[in-house]
Amino acid sequence: MIEQLSVRNVALIQSLALEFGAQFTALSGETGAGKSMILGALSFLCGQKVGPDLIRKDENEAWVSAVFRCDHAPRAVHTWLAERSIEPEHHRVLLRRVMRRTGRGTAWIQNVPVSRADLEFFTSFFIDLHGQHEHQSLFRVAEHRRFLDTYGGLQQEVDAFTACYAALAERRAQLQRLASCEHNRQERLEFLSFALEELEHAALDVHEERALEGEEQKLCQHEKLCDVMQRVDAAIRGVDLQEGALLSSLKKALGALESACGIDGSLEPARARLESAYYEIEDVAHVLRTYTDGIQFCPDRLQHVQERLALIYRLKKKYGGTVAQVLEYRARAQQEMQDLSQAVGDKEALEQDVQRLMAQVLHAGRALSLKRHAVAEAFRTRVEGVLHRLGMASTRFHVQICTRDEQCAKQRTGPYGFDDVEFLISANAGEPARPLAKIASGGELSRVMLALKTVLSSVDEVGTLIFDEIDVGIGGETARAVAEHLQALSEHKQVVCITHLAMIAAHADAHVCVKKESSGEHTNTSAAHVVGERRVQEVARMLAGDTHSATSLAHAQELLRAGARQRRGECGD
């Protein structure tokens, strides 16, 4: 349950602090005073997504905090806290959330930073907040299934069916993609097969191209190369070492230098170097002569080299900019072809998966339908009983479950089973049951929603029920019935209710009055518990808009006494 709520700089609220008792608290105030702002602040603390518009004008941040008592909370709450090393203090935890003008926010539980989603999950174990116009959700037939499943405790079965259904849908989608791509797959396989055959036959080597280009150049310029090499040989060796050739001149110079060394020994190093140069050049001349003698022109070889290079250039243009890239393409093509070739096997496996999952879906769907039919009657009886206590004695409540047969379910089903669930109402004796949207007034819808919340609260562990204007469209004896019902409900749950009806406020254990006051350019919403004479005056205002007339005050006092007697379990008008 929630024990304390503190709000600062939220909308019109500058600063507000409230304490809540364990039973029934009513919030009242003039229209527009800001009652719903208080619940809006609580919704913000409970993880609702909001923007910086929440922040009060001229302020930089808004914050809300609350103390929750958790000694009677579900075991899942304590496990969740322990996993995050959050320790309650005296069975209580402090929740805080801040929203800054920049749009960024921060949240804590017991000074441990948490996410917005953490707040939303954690508080879902404590609070069920019925906001304004939530009764309109009764017009959404899809919500009816959720109500029934919640009452029957079927969420685990629904989740299991949903998971199986999702797996089936995914396998079917994969099969459909395979079927739609079958033609393209065959074309792609044919192309890859041709490309790989072409590349395998080519047997490219990453170093081959450069070698072939060098060989082609030599073969194409054979005559020029031979002429150049002959001239080089003539310059070095001459013809039979004729006069003027390089080697002949060096040999003469070496002989002269040897004579000079006999006169001056310091010339010996120079002679040695010249001698070394002579033999080095002689060796080069031999190498070049051997090279020249080996030059041969082969037209067939030139044709082969040019054809091979033409093939390499064509494959590079077709499959990649370089031979290395062509080889990479070949590797990718081999893998793709392998994957595409496996698609036939994948298709067979997927078809088997679809059959297996369909059998599971049918089994789970049938079991879920049986359980829904089993709990529907008990749910109908309990809701109808609450409606009778809320002044709808002639009303008959029906739970209509339309279950698709197995053949239809194979073709068309949804993630929540084979059943379409809809609540129907017969408001008067003898009238046929009709959808809520066609028969229920605003007051009837509010009471139907209250009945549903009451019945559902008996099967969940949420300790606090919060209602915003659950009394819309009712008055008189109906208001008395709703007030007494809320009071009875508060014996087992903490109930907080925003109300415009004096009858409901008078039956509450505690009464909070919300006011809006203006000072200069600023407007502020405040809230405080009213007791004694102040509570009498507030109930009188709710009755007749008059806080001073003796008649209104007397009527208010009588309502409060009746509410007190009801809380004590005493009989009387």
Curated annotation (Swiss-Prot):
GO cellular component annotations of the record: bacterial nucleoid
GO biological process: DNA recombination; DNA repair; SOS response
Binding positions for ATP per the UniProt entry: G29, E30, T31, G32, A33, G34, K35, S36
Pfam family membership, one: SMC_N
Molecular function (Gene Ontology), one example: ATP binding
Family annotation (InterPro entries): DNA_recomb/repair_RecN, P-loop_NTPase, RecF/RecN/SMC_N
Keyword annotations of the record: ATP-binding, DNA damage, DNA repair, Nucleotide-binding
Listed Gene3D superfamilies: P-loop containing nucleotide triphosphate hydrolases (3.40.50.300)
Parts forming coiled coils: none
Family statement: Belongs to the RecN family.
NCBIfam families per the UniProt record, alphabetical: recN (TIGR00634)
Function description: May be involved in recombinational repair of damaged DNA.
UniProt xrefs under PANTHER family: DNA REPAIR PROTEIN RECN
Protein name per UniProt: DNA repair protein RecN
